[in-house]
Amino acid sequence: MDAAAADIRYLNTLRVHWKRNKAFPSMAKMADVVGLKSAAGVFALVGRLSDAGYLQRTDGRIAPTKKFFSYRLLGSVRAGVPQEVDQYEGFEVLNVEDYLIAHPERTSFCTVRGDSMTGAGLLDGDIVVVEHNTPTKPGDIVVAVVDGRATVKSLALEAGEYVLKPENPAYEVIRPGESLEVLGVVVGSFRSMRR
Protein backbone atom coordinates (compact mmCIF):
# COMPACT_ATOMS: atom_id res chain seq x y z
CA MET A 1 0.00 0.00 0.00
CA ASP A 2 1.43 3.40 -0.94
CA ALA A 3 1.87 6.16 1.65
CA ALA A 4 -1.09 8.25 0.42
CA ALA A 5 -3.47 5.27 0.62
CA ALA A 6 -2.14 4.39 4.08
CA ASP A 7 -2.71 7.98 5.26
CA ILE A 8 -6.33 7.85 4.02
CA ARG A 9 -6.78 4.59 5.94
CA TYR A 10 -5.32 6.21 9.09
CA LEU A 11 -7.52 9.28 8.55
CA ASN A 12 -10.63 7.11 8.28
CA THR A 13 -9.62 5.24 11.44
CA LEU A 14 -9.35 8.59 13.25
CA ARG A 15 -12.79 9.57 11.91
CA VAL A 16 -14.27 6.36 13.33
CA HIS A 17 -12.57 7.08 16.67
CA TRP A 18 -14.01 10.62 16.66
CA LYS A 19 -17.53 9.36 15.86
CA ARG A 20 -17.43 6.84 18.70
CA ASN A 21 -15.72 8.99 21.33
CA LYS A 22 -16.44 12.61 20.30
CA ALA A 23 -12.83 13.28 21.19
CA PHE A 24 -9.44 13.02 19.58
CA PRO A 25 -6.83 10.59 20.95
CA SER A 26 -3.74 11.97 22.64
CA MET A 27 -0.42 11.55 20.86
CA ALA A 28 0.39 8.74 23.31
CA LYS A 29 -2.82 6.84 22.49
CA MET A 30 -2.85 7.55 18.76
CA ALA A 31 -0.38 4.76 17.99
CA ASP A 32 -2.83 2.22 19.42
CA VAL A 33 -5.82 3.81 17.68
CA VAL A 34 -4.31 3.81 14.18
CA GLY A 35 -2.06 0.77 14.60
CA LEU A 36 1.37 2.37 14.39
CA LYS A 37 4.25 0.92 16.37
CA SER A 38 6.35 4.00 17.14
CA ALA A 39 5.99 7.55 18.40
CA ALA A 40 8.05 8.68 15.40
CA GLY A 41 5.48 7.13 13.08
CA VAL A 42 2.67 8.95 14.91
CA PHE A 43 4.50 12.29 14.73
CA ALA A 44 5.14 11.78 11.01
CA LEU A 45 1.47 10.88 10.40
CA VAL A 46 0.23 13.90 12.35
CA GLY A 47 2.61 16.07 10.34
CA ARG A 48 1.33 14.73 7.01
CA LEU A 49 -2.34 15.01 8.02
CA SER A 50 -1.69 18.55 9.32
CA ASP A 51 0.06 19.52 6.08
CA ALA A 52 -2.91 18.11 4.14
CA GLY A 53 -5.28 20.26 6.24
CA TYR A 54 -7.06 17.50 8.20
CA LEU A 55 -5.51 18.23 11.61
CA GLN A 56 -4.19 21.26 13.45
CA ARG A 57 -1.96 21.63 16.46
CA THR A 58 -3.30 24.02 19.08
CA ASP A 59 -1.65 24.57 22.46
CA GLY A 60 0.23 21.29 22.19
CA ARG A 61 -2.92 19.33 21.34
CA ILE A 62 -4.14 17.87 18.09
CA ALA A 63 -7.58 18.84 16.84
CA PRO A 64 -9.56 18.03 13.71
CA THR A 65 -10.16 20.79 11.18
CA LYS A 66 -13.25 21.40 9.07
CA LYS A 67 -11.60 19.36 6.29
CA PHE A 68 -11.41 16.38 8.69
CA PHE A 69 -15.23 16.29 8.53
CA SER A 70 -15.32 16.55 4.73
CA TYR A 71 -15.79 13.53 2.51
CA ARG A 72 -15.07 12.65 -1.10
CA LEU A 73 -17.68 13.66 -3.65
CA LEU A 74 -17.12 11.14 -6.40
CA GLY A 75 -19.22 12.87 -9.00
CA SER A 76 -22.71 12.08 -10.18
CA VAL A 77 -24.54 8.85 -10.85
CA ARG A 78 -27.60 8.51 -13.05
CA ALA A 79 -30.88 7.42 -11.55
CA GLY A 80 -32.16 6.52 -15.04
CA VAL A 81 -30.19 4.70 -17.71
CA PRO A 82 -26.80 3.55 -16.38
CA GLN A 83 -23.75 5.40 -17.68
CA GLU A 84 -20.09 4.57 -18.15
CA VAL A 85 -18.19 4.47 -14.87
CA ASP A 86 -15.66 7.24 -14.38
CA GLN A 87 -12.38 6.20 -12.86
CA TYR A 88 -12.66 8.90 -10.17
CA GLU A 89 -8.99 9.77 -10.41
CA GLY A 90 -9.67 13.19 -8.98
CA PHE A 91 -12.48 14.08 -6.65
CA GLU A 92 -14.02 17.02 -4.92
CA VAL A 93 -14.43 17.24 -1.18
CA LEU A 94 -17.81 17.96 0.41
CA ASN A 95 -18.42 19.19 3.92
CA VAL A 96 -22.07 18.50 4.72
CA GLU A 97 -22.25 21.42 7.15
CA ASP A 98 -21.02 23.84 4.49
CA TYR A 99 -23.42 22.34 1.96
CA LEU A 100 -26.54 22.60 4.14
CA ILE A 101 -25.87 25.46 6.55
CA ALA A 102 -25.22 29.00 5.34
CA HIS A 103 -25.93 30.75 8.66
CA PRO A 104 -25.03 28.51 11.63
CA GLU A 105 -26.00 31.20 14.14
CA ARG A 106 -29.64 31.00 13.05
CA THR A 107 -30.03 27.39 11.92
CA SER A 108 -31.72 24.46 13.64
CA PHE A 109 -33.06 21.04 12.68
CA CYS A 110 -36.54 19.53 12.99
CA THR A 111 -37.77 15.99 12.41
CA VAL A 112 -40.68 15.70 9.98
CA ARG A 113 -43.65 13.69 11.25
CA GLY A 114 -46.45 12.72 8.88
CA ASP A 115 -46.87 12.54 5.11
CA SER A 116 -48.39 15.90 4.13
CA MET A 117 -45.17 17.04 2.39
CA THR A 118 -44.29 13.96 0.33
CA GLY A 119 -44.86 15.88 -2.91
CA ALA A 120 -41.99 18.17 -1.91
CA GLY A 121 -39.78 15.16 -1.17
CA LEU A 122 -40.11 15.39 2.62
CA LEU A 123 -40.88 12.02 4.17
CA ASP A 124 -41.84 10.99 7.69
CA GLY A 125 -38.65 10.91 9.77
CA ASP A 126 -36.64 13.24 7.51
CA ILE A 127 -34.58 15.95 9.17
CA VAL A 128 -35.18 19.45 7.80
CA VAL A 129 -32.65 22.26 8.06
CA VAL A 130 -34.50 25.37 9.24
CA GLU A 131 -33.05 28.85 8.84
CA HIS A 132 -34.59 31.39 11.24
CA ASN A 133 -34.93 35.15 10.73
CA THR A 134 -34.94 34.71 6.96
CA PRO A 135 -37.31 36.64 4.68
CA THR A 136 -40.06 34.39 3.34
CA LYS A 137 -41.93 34.38 0.07
CA PRO A 138 -44.79 32.33 -1.35
CA GLY A 139 -43.50 28.94 -2.43
CA ASP A 140 -41.04 28.61 0.46
CA ILE A 141 -41.36 25.54 2.64
CA VAL A 142 -41.61 26.83 6.19
CA VAL A 143 -41.88 25.65 9.76
CA ALA A 144 -44.75 27.66 11.17
CA VAL A 145 -46.98 27.95 14.19
CA VAL A 146 -50.59 28.38 13.18
CA ASP A 147 -53.14 29.02 15.90
CA GLY A 148 -50.71 27.62 18.48
CA ARG A 149 -49.80 24.44 16.58
CA ALA A 150 -46.53 23.77 14.72
CA THR A 151 -46.32 22.34 11.21
CA VAL A 152 -44.13 22.22 8.11
CA LYS A 153 -45.88 23.33 4.91
CA SER A 154 -45.44 25.40 1.76
CA LEU A 155 -46.24 29.07 2.26
CA ALA A 156 -48.81 30.33 -0.25
CA LEU A 157 -50.75 33.52 -0.87
CA GLU A 158 -54.47 33.18 -1.62
CA ALA A 159 -56.75 36.21 -1.97
CA GLY A 160 -54.13 38.37 -0.27
CA GLU A 161 -53.86 36.09 2.78
CA TYR A 162 -51.04 33.73 3.68
CA VAL A 163 -52.01 30.07 3.92
CA LEU A 164 -50.07 26.87 4.55
CA LYS A 165 -50.29 24.43 1.68
CA PRO A 166 -49.56 20.71 2.06
CA GLU A 167 -47.73 18.94 -0.76
CA ASN A 168 -50.01 15.91 -0.67
CA PRO A 169 -53.53 16.05 -2.19
CA ALA A 170 -54.92 14.02 0.74
CA TYR A 171 -54.56 17.11 2.96
CA GLU A 172 -56.33 20.46 2.89
CA VAL A 173 -54.83 23.93 2.85
CA ILE A 174 -54.50 25.41 6.34
CA ARG A 175 -56.02 28.86 6.63
CA PRO A 176 -54.96 30.55 9.87
CA GLY A 177 -57.84 31.42 12.16
CA GLU A 178 -56.12 33.79 14.54
CA SER A 179 -52.36 33.67 14.13
CA LEU A 180 -49.60 32.53 11.83
CA GLU A 181 -45.95 32.78 12.83
CA VAL A 182 -43.21 31.54 10.53
CA LEU A 183 -40.42 30.11 12.69
CA GLY A 184 -38.08 29.56 9.76
CA VAL A 185 -37.57 28.56 6.15
CA VAL A 186 -36.63 24.98 5.26
CA VAL A 187 -33.37 25.27 3.32
CA GLY A 188 -32.45 21.59 3.14
CA SER A 189 -33.25 18.09 4.31
CA PHE A 190 -31.60 14.75 4.81
CA ARG A 191 -32.48 11.20 5.80
CA SER A 192 -30.78 7.97 6.69
CA MET A 193 -31.60 5.19 4.26
CA ARG A 194 -30.98 2.66 7.05
CA ARG A 195 -33.66 3.60 9.56
Question: What are the residue ranges of the model-derived segments?
Answer:
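Alpha-helix initiation/capping motif
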Residues: A3, I101, R175-S179
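Extreme N-terminal segment that seeds HTH/winged-HTH DNA-binding domains in transcriptional regulators
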Residues: M1-D32
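C-terminal regulatory/effector modules of DNA-binding transcriptional regulators
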Residues: L122-R195
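Short, positionally conserved secondary-structure boundary motifs
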Residues: A5, K29-D32, A40-L123, A150, ...
